Amino acid sequence: MASIKHFFLVFICVSVLLTSGLADYKFHVCDPSFDEKDCDFECKEFGHPGGYCRPDRVQPRIRMCYCTDR
């Protein structure tokens, strides 16, 4: 019984870890020549529901275009 509980606990933890970073897809660097409207348009062209510009998670000084998957 304890092994079944441990299995489900590990399964849930692994599922959360694997899916937490899949919501957004990094697409392009945002700069004055590629703004939020361009980001949204390009993401929609590639089949995503939309896109937005935000600071990069690794290098916050760089603004990146992220395409949403939901």
Curated annotation (Swiss-Prot):
Belongs to the DEFL family. Disulfide bonds join C30-C53, C39-C65, C43-C67. Residues 1-23 form the signal peptide. This is Putative defensin-like protein 280. Keywords: Antimicrobial, Disulfide bond, Fungicide, Plant defense, Secreted, Signal. One of its GO terms (biological process) is defense response to fungus. It is found in: Secreted. GO terms for cellular component: extracellular region. Its main location: secreted.
